[in-house]
């Protein structure tokens, strides 16, 4: 029931927030904070109440499951479950949700209730994606979260919001349709082999279609997830969507939505089609490396801060793709840490970019300059997250990238070497942000408020998390370990 | 005819009597509200006797009709749709200066034609049903007779209908020449015993019949009339045309297809596959170019007929279920979408340009929300009945391994998303101040709004929990095969 409650809190919270706008514009914001905070605490409690919270183990590593029939005619079940991996991502989702509400506190000025409704529903969809163990249910959550995200960009976005929201929806929906056909073909192959029609992840793990079919189905899954990730030839929706989305939307997009693609690769593509995925791994890893380098090079060329962060996200998610397809214990742990650390650091960077845009009414870095003098708090925090993004040892991003490269090195030396180049390019673009925005002479004498206490609390928490991930990531390893090991075992057989 | 036959035919008999009675009422006493209420009562009565007829089904009424679960299901769908259109049209027809009463008589007659199609098991009843439906539709289309566009739509439909009737008759003649049979059942036995000497005439006849029906269903390349007629027709009639008339013809087509064992005729399958691909692509591509909501919805409905053809070609149990489920979804979505247009329009001022809908969310959030749901459902986004319908067709297609058609379907859905999103975005754009002033907060017709709310509820209910509907449809599909 806890799993249903997690979804219900967000869904009902969204509706209440929408209605509550009538009374006072602050109501929706508080309701969202309450709903997300409540979810966050429930998840945290769920984790800490395990017999041995830092070493989750047991059969299949499922902490909690819920399984009910839904559409018996097609063998579809309402099957949700959490293991260490899902729990980590669910925690990230709720945490960044809180951050997104804080980031939109002053930015969103009209239709506040509807904004928070959409925000909470996106997060409900994402939570569902992380928890669904029935492929049909997974697909439903996968598609449902697009609609509120689309509204977030299309209604509250910046100047070119309409084309950007179109692109976002069309790209991800196209991937979704491929995914749907792939899921159906998988289920039907299973049906032909066993006579049982089911969409259950656990049943389909043993579906074993013939190699050629498996390859095509795998490709359908892979394309859908790499569009969302995004991997390089399929990435072109991302810079526009990120740039045009309101700050809260960008935080959710970069921090959480991209992770659903990575999660799909990790949870579905490799375990469901171990052989096909192993054959395909070189191509996938090549795409990962291309993403790392391409994203970093293009980030370097941007003038718009949000675009820069968006391209850097492509680069960072390339590491995740690389790690997933290297498919050994080290690389997988690295991919998970990278997902969490990138969620936090990109979220924070977008919040800073949003704060700057709100104050300066521009995202052009050429016109920023000299923030150190005018807003020391914003400047110091920007510096921190910029160096976090470039992979400074001791911070979470470094830990993720390092482990991914270490694991990749075992799988393929050339890919590891090429991926490592990305670390150098990251330094270039991160230092460019610092140089252009923080240093130098201000273009004009501006007066604007620095970060408030509320912002500082949010930022401070994120800084602490990055330190934690960088200095003492063991609890996270322990938490993800059984799930990752379980996934790996599936591919051994 | 035995009493069982009468029981089985009750829905048809009742609706015939109802249209006659209504004519007499209108002749004696003209009163808009009274006529409308009488229509509602008639339709509810027709719906109420369907369970009675179902109790004796399947019942052959030789030689013309077969009353089985399949026929009764579609009749239920047709009468419910007519009911919804009556409720939606009431507010709209009030705006008509002269004599709105006959509209309801024609609506009942058209429903009678559609119901006959759903139950017909013989070429003669097919033709009769189709003509009753079409002739009432000419009049309905041109009902606001002072408006040029409506008249034009009526005339266009008249010419198209005569052409398609001619083709249909010629096709029937060819089949009769070859087999000597006009009943679907006879045809099916002749075909299964292999009594046919040469298939040429039979196939040519079948192709001509498909063409004739294809005009009514607006398959590409027989679609050219659709957008003009949809645009010109009064909004509630457009809703009727898009749903009831097409649904009934498709129901008949499916029955014919199953009876003559369509999948066995390779040429026919190839032909229909081409038509499906062309219909999906052309419908969606042409919709992209429109700025008129009615035209966009017209082309989108062409595309949806293409999707339905994919399910028809998949055939088998799952194919028939998919077709039937998709029709339910299609009825809800299109009644809803055209319903929104209807409640905002009046005969003198049809709200059909995309411009008219810009910023609707800001002054009519409820209506914009309903429209958004309808459009998302048309686009096949989950938690709407449209998604389950699409899923059904995908499932049938995957089972029958129709990869080419499925990929066309995917392409079509992606293209479709462009124009559905275009409308949605227009709904949520912030209106300019002058626009705000123009959008006078005139009250919406109550009954129309309630109907729309109910449709939205069904759309979500069956989108989230489709199991009860699926069970019914399984039984329906079983009856046909």
Swiss-Prot record, chain B:
The primary gene name is nuoN1
Family matches, as HAMAP family? NDH1_NuoN_1
Please name the InterPro entries in this protein's record: NADH-Q_OxRdtase_suN/2 (IPR010096), ND/Mrp_TM (IPR001750)
GO terms, biological process: ATP synthesis coupled electron transport
Q: Which UniProt keywords apply?
A: Cell inner membrane, Cell membrane, Membrane, NAD, Quinone, Translocase, Transmembrane, Transmembrane helix, Transport, Ubiquinone
How does the record describe its quaternary structure? Answer: NDH-1 is composed of 14 different subunits. Subunits NuoA, H, J, K, L, M, N constitute the membrane sector of the complex.
Q: Which GO terms describe its molecular function?
A: NADH dehydrogenase (ubiquinone) activity; NADH:ubiquinone reductase (non-electrogenic) activity; quinone binding
Q: Where in the cell is it found?
A: Cell inner membrane
tRNA processing as a keyword of this entry, yes or no, is no
Segments passing through the bilayer: 6-26, 36-56, 71-91, 100-120, 123-143, 157-177, 200-220, 234-254, 268-288, 296-316, 323-343, 368-388, 401-421, 444-464
**According to Swiss-Prot or TrEMBL, what is its membrane topology?**
Multi-pass membrane protein
So which domain of life are we looking at?
Answer: Bacteria
Q: Does the keyword NADP apply?
A: no
The entry sums up its family as follows: Belongs to the complex I subunit 2 family.
Function of the molecule = NDH-1 shuttles electrons from NADH, via FMN and iron-sulfur (Fe-S) centers, to quinones in the respiratory chain. The immediate electron acceptor for the enzyme in this species is believed to be ubiquinone. Couples the redox reaction to proton translocation (for every two electrons transferred, four hydrogen ions are translocated across the cytoplasmic membrane), and thus conserves the redox energy in a proton gradient.
Q: Which GO terms describe its cellular component?
A: plasma membrane
Which chemical reaction does it catalyze? a quinone + NADH + 5 H(+)(in) = a quinol + NAD(+) + 4 H(+)(out)
> What is this protein called in UniProt?
NADH-quinone oxidoreductase subunit N 1
| Entry-linked Pfam families | Proton_antipo_M
- What EC identifiers does the entry list? 7.1.1.-
């Amino acid at each position: 029931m806890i799993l249903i409650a997690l979804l219900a809190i967000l869904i009902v919270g969204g509706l209440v927030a929408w209605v509550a706008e009538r009374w006072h514009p602050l109501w929706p914001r508080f309701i969202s904070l309450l709903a997300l905070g409540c979810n966050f605490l429930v998840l945290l409690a769920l984790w800490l109440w395990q017999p041995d919270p830092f070493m989750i183990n047991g059969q299949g590593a499922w902490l909690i499951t819920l399984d009910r029939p839904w559409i018996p005619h097609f063998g579809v079940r309402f099957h949700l479950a959490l293991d260490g991996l899902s729990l980590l991502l669910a925690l990230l989702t709720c945490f960044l949700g809180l951050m997104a509400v804080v980031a939109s506190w002053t930015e969103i000025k009209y239709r506040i209730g509807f904004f928070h409704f959409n925000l909470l529903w996106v997060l409900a969809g994402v939570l569902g994606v992380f928890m669904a163990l029935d492929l049909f249910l997974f697909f439903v959550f996968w598609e449902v979260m697009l609609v509120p995200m689309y509204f977030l960009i299309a209604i509250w976005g910046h100047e070119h919001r309409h084309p950007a929201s179109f692109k976002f929806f069309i790209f991800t929906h196209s991937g979704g349709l491929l995914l749907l056909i792939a899921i159906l073909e998988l289920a039907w192959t299973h049906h032909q082999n066993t006579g049982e029609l089911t969409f259950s992840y656990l049943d389909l793990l043993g579906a074993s279609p013939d190699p050629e079919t498996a390859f095509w189905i795998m490709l359908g899954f892979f394309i859908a997830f790499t569009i969302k990730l995004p991997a390089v030839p399929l990435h072109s929706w991302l810079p526009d969507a990120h740039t045009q989305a309101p700050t809260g939307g960008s935080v959710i997009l970069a921090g959480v939505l991209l992770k659903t693609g990575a999660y799909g690769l990790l949870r579905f593509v490799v375990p469901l089609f171990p052989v096909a995925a192993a054959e395909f791994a070189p191509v996938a890893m090549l795409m990962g490396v291309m993403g790392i380098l391409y994203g970093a090079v293009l980030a370097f060329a941007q003038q718009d801060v949000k675009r820069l962060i968006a391209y850097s996200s492509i680069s960072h998610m390339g590491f995740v793709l690389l790690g997933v397809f290297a498919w050994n214990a080290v690389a997988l742990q690295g991919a998970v840490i990278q997902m969490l650390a990138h969620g936090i650091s990109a979220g924070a960077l977008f919040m800073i970019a949003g704060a700057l845009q709100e104050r300066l009414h521009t995202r052009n870095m050429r016109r920023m300059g000299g923030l150190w003098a005018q807003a020391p708090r914003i400047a110091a925090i920007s510096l921190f997250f910029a160096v976090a993004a470039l992979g400074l040892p001791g911070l979470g991003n470094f830990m993720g990238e390092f482990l991914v490269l270490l694991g990749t090195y075992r799988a393929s030396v050339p890919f590891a070497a090429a991926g490592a180049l990305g670390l150098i390019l990251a330094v270039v673009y991160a230092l460019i942000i610092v140089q252009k925005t923080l240093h130098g002479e201000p273009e004009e004498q501006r007066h604007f408020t620095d970060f408030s206490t509320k912002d500082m609390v949010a930022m401070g928490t994120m800084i602490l998390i990055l330190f934690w991930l960088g200095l003492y990531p063991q609890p996270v390893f322990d938490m993800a370990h059984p799930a990752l090991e379980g996934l790996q075992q599936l591919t051994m057989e | 005819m035995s009493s069982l036959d009468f029981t089985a035919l009750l829905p048809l008999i009742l609706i015939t009597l109802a249209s006659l009675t209504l004519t007499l009422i209108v002749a004696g006493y003209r009163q808009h509200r009274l006529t409308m209420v009488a229509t509602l009562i008639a339709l509810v009565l027709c719906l109420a006797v369907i369970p009675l007829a179902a109790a004796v089904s399947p019942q052959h009424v030789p030689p013309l009709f077969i009353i089985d679960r399949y026929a009764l299901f579609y009749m239920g769908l047709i009468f419910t749709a007519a009911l919804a259109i009556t409720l939606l049209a009431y507010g709209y027809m009030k705006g008509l200066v002269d004599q709105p009463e006959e509209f309801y008589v024609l609506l009942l007659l058209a429903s009678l034609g559609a119901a006959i199609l759903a139950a017909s098991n013989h070429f003669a009843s097919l033709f009769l049903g189709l003509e009753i439906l079409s002739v009432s539709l000419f009049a309905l289309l041109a009902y606001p007779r002072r408006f040029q566009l409506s008249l034009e739509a009526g005339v266009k439909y008249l010419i198209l209908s005569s052409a398609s009737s001619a083709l249909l008759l010629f096709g029937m003649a060819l089949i009769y020449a070859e087999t000597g049979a006009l009943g679907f059942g006879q045809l099916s036995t002749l075909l299964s015993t292999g009594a046919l000497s040469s298939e040429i005439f039979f196939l040519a006849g079948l192709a001509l019949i498909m063409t004739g029906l294809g005009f009514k269903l607006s398959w590409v390349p027989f679609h050219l009339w659709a957008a003009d007629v949809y645009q010109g027709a009064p909004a509630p009639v457009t809703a009727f045309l898009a749903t009831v008339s097409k649904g009934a013809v498709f129901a008949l087509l499916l029955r014919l297809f199953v009876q003559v064992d369509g999948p066995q005729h390779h040429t026919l399958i190839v032909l229909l596959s081409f038509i499906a691909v062309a219909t999906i692509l052309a419908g969606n591509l042409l919709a992209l170019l429109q700025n008129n909501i009615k035209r966009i919805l017209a082309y989108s409905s062409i595309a949806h007929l293409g999707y339905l053809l994919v399910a028809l070609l998949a055939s088998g149990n799952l194919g028939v279920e998919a077709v039937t489920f998709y029709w339910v979804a299609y009825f809800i979505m299109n009644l809803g979408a055209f319903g929104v247009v209807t409640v905002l329009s009046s005969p003198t001022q049809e709200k059909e340009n995309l411009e008219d809908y810009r910023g609707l969310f800001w002054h009519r959030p409820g209506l914009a929300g309903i429209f958004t749901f309808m459009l998302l459902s048309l686009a096949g986004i989950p938690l709407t009945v449209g998604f389950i319908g699409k899923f059904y067709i995908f499932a049938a297609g995957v089972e029958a391994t129709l990869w080419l058609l499925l990929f066309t379907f995917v392409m079509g859905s992606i293209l479709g998303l462009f124009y559905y999103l275009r409308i949605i975005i227009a709904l949520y754009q912030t209106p300019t101040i002058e626009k705000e002033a123009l959008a006078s907060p005139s009250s919406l017709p109550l009954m129309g709004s309630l109907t729309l709310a109910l449709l939205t509820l069904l759309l979500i209910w069956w989108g989230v929990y489709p199991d009860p509907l699926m069970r019914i449809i399984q039984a329906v599909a079983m009856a046909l095969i």
